[in-house]
């Protein structure tokens, strides 16, 4: 009886013991000042899975065995922060962890190199990026011994973290599955050779969101917004559609709305889903150039999403080449939706289809379009008109939605006409 009671008490005592959770290094300005005289560099790996979302665990146990929550058959995301001049924890970190684990059943490893990124000497943090990459490569070699695969590794690096990801990729000769650079740091990297910065050759698939041109690129508005755009693309139901183009100037005047090269997958999307276009993008690299540059516009606040449509017009004959047409988009309530049109001055020729890219701020059902024709001359022309054979509106953001049409329209000068839209003829869908 005494033995039985003793064993029960032992079991109770053990079950009451709580596991210690790892925490991101909490540093401050004092640590930045201390670094001026005593430089430090430490790296910690904090592992999360859906089994331990609220409690970060070490990737390896004290005996160097692999954490039992790590599944070598699943994708592994490595999240690497950047320069932290006053040692603060990245404000986006916890939210990023949540949206990534909500999106996919993965191994998620936060690379905490705050002791090394926290310094007033930016150049020192830059030099530490290569050292962190070497430390990471040692842990990766250990994972490979346990059966992990480089092809399943997706590095997401922010600022200096993007270049750390690139240096890791170089160590493994470009065999990492994917690297995503979110606003890669420019100072001390811009203009450098491919060996000294993140490069498209550092992984099998490299995508970058920043304000310069490189890799498969998405153009953004301001510093570090890339992080929030990437998260928004995960959290919202909006497709952040982007358009392949040689320059932002050409994109703005509507010269780059053709995504036929991307086949049935339509235009590529920003963020986590960009890898759906991996095979097509690699094929484009082999056939044409070393990288694909794409553009998109966003709103200034979360969730940042806008909605793209292509408005195509086919005229019956060449009527007034010196005129232009204005457009209004009306929703089902008859309210005008603000639209941005990407277009240049275009002459209309018989049975030629002219496409205009339109961007709306709201995801609404467009029920009608208002058109007004103006000629360039100041003199009123009562006989001037455009004869439109077909007008078609198709969503680019949601290509699965059927296009809407109207047929046989005559526009007189300065006279606004509202056209109700309905399903297009079967042969045109």
Q: Each predicted region: which residue ranges?
A:
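The feature captures the conserved acid-bearing segment of alpha/beta-hydrolase catalytic domains
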Residues: 177, 181-217
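Flexible, membrane-associating and regulatory peripheral segments of lipid-active enzymes
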Residues: 2-110, 117-128, 138-150, 196-200, ...
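A short glycine-rich beta-strand->turn/loop micro-motif centered on a GG-aromatic cluster
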Residues: 110-112, 181
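Short, structured coil segments at secondary-structure junctions
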Residues: 104, 172-175, 202
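Glycine-rich nucleophile elbow surrounding the catalytic serine of serine-hydrolase chemistry
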Residues: 81, 155-168
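Short, well-ordered amphipathic alpha-helical segments that serve as non-catalytic structural scaffolds
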Residues: 135-140, 206
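Solvent-exposed loop/turn segments at secondary-structure junctions
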Residues: 83-86, 114-118, 160-162, 185-188, ...
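Alpha/beta-hydrolase fold nucleophile elbow
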Residues: 147-159, 179
């Amino acid at each position: 009886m005494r033995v039985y009671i003793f064993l029960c008490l032992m079991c109770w005592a053990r079950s009451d013991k709580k596991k210690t959770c790892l925490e991101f290094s909490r540093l401050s300005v004092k640590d930045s000042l201390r670094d001026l005289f005593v430089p430090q560099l430490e790296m910690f790996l904090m592992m999360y899975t859906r089994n331990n979302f609220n409690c970060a665990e070490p990737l390896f146990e004290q005996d160097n065995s692999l954490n039992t929550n790590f599944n070598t058959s699943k994708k592994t995301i490595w999240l690497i922060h950047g320069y932290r001049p006053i040692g603060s924890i990245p404000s986006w970190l916890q939210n990023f962890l949540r949206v990534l684990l909500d999106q996919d059943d993965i191994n998620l490893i936060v690379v905490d190199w705050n002791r090394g990124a926290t310094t007033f000497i930016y150049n020192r943090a830059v030099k530490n990026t290569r050292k962190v990459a070497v430390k990471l490569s040692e842990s990766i070699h250990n994972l490979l011994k346990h059966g992990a695969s480089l092809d399943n590794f997706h590095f997401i690096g922010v600022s200096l973290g993007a270049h750390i990801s690139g240096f890791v990729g170089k160590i493994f000769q470009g065999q990492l599955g994917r690297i995503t650079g979110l606003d890669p740091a420019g100072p001390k990297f811009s203009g450098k050779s491919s060996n000294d910065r993140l490069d498209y050759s550092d992984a099998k698939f490299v995508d970058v969101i920043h304000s310069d041109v490189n890799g498969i690129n998405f153009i953004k508005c301001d510093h570090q917004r890339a992080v929030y755009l990437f998260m928004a693309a995960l959290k919202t139901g909006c497709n952040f559609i982007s358009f392949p183009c040689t320059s932002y100037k050409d994109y703005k005047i509507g010269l780059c709305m053709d995504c036929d090269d991307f086949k049935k997958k339509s235009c590529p999307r920003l963020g986590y889903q960009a890898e759906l276009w991996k095979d097509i993008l690699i094929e484009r690299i082999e056939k044409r150039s070393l990288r694909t540059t794409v553009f998109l516009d966003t709103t200034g606040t979360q969730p940042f999403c806008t909605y793209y449509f292509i408005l195509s017009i086919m005229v019956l004959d060449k009527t007034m080449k010196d005129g232009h047409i204005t457009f209004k988009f009306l929703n089902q309530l008859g309210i005008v939706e603000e639209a941005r049109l990407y277009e240049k001055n275009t002459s209309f020729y018989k049975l030629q289809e002219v496409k205009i890219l339109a961007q709306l701020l709201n995801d609404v059902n467009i029920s009608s379009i208002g058109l007004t024709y103006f000629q360039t001359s100041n003199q009123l022309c009562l006989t001037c008109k455009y004869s439109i054979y077909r007008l078609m509106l198709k969503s680019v953001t949601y290509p699965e939605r059927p296009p809407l049409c109207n047929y046989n329209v005559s526009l007189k000068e300065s006279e606004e006409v509202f056209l109700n839209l309905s399903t297009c003829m079967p042969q045109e869908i």
